[in-house]
Amino acid sequence: MLYEESILHLATAGQFIVCNDKYGLPGTVLPAYCTAAGKLFLSQLDDETLETWVRSHNLVPYTANTIIDPDELLKQIRQTRERGYGIVISELYDFVACISIPVISQDNRVLGALNF
């Protein structure tokens, strides 16, 4: 879920490769702008709110692939909106790619996300 400027992991299921000792554990907070789920949730904001969000946050590079240019980030988030799912490749951790698909309510609201 989107929590202020971050993504908050609520639950984890199955086996996964651990990048560090806290990645993916319930309660983990990660930056929204460089995670697949974060881009998915940000894509649900209207254009004005999204633009304000991106331009008001300090975009820190975690890897050489982290997008820190606001215009490029806005472009990627809008592509996420068009696609309907989020993708990142080595933006938060080197050599880690993620796809995030939405969990949608009956009235078409994004309630959460599943990450792979």
Q: Language-model segments: which ranges?
A:
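Amphipathic alpha-helical effector-binding/dimerization core
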Residues: M1-S56
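Intrinsically disordered, low-complexity polar/acidic regions
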Residues: Y62-T63, D94
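Structured helix-beta-strand junction loops
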Residues: S56-H57, R83
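Extended hydrophobic
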Residues: D69-F116
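Short coil/turn linker and secondary-structure boundary residues
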Residues: L45, I67-I68
